[in-house]
């Protein structure tokens, strides 16, 4: 699923949740089509999350070469990553886990809103009914 989310909209989202430290890159109108935290999974138009204990700046370089439009990092790594990729749009957040949840949902077009919900109640037959419903792909 693709979306029309931009870097500016992602920065606004993080700011509205009080976790934006710095951001709003010059390329604020760049379209974001997804998000990834593994440089091997980055696609053109993705935002790349720089996180984890084993994170290496080479992962950011690889993600940008693959087509990442920007990266998101925490304040502890911001200076080092700015040195690694000085021309890349950077967004710095105070809460990486929350940012990953918010940005991923927005970048992928909120697929969680398209999940059908079915309630099955009663004394007997709930498991059978649930199984039968799963087979007809509601």
Where in the sequence are the language-model features?
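N-terminal leader/targeting and accessory segments in enzymes
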Residues: 1-102
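Phosphate-binding loop of NTP-binding sites
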Residues: 98-137
């Amino acid at each position: 699923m693709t979306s029309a989310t931009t870097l500016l909209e992602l920065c606004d989202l993080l700011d509205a949740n009080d976790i934006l430290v710095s951001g709003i890159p010059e390329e604020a109108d760049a379209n974001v089509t997804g998000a990834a935290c593994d440089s091997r999974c980055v696609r053109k138009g993705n935002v790349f999350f720089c996180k984890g204990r084993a994170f290496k700046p080479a992962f950011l370089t690889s993600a940008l070469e693959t087509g990442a439009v920007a990266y998101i990092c925490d304040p502890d790594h911001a200076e080092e990553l700015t040195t690694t990729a000085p021309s890349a749009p950077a967004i710095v957040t105070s809460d990486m886990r929350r940012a990953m949840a918010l940005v991923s949902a927005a970048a992928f077009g909120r697929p969680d809103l398209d999940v059908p919900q079915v309630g099955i109640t009663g004394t007997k037959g709930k498991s059978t009914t649930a199984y039968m419903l799963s087979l007809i792909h509601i």
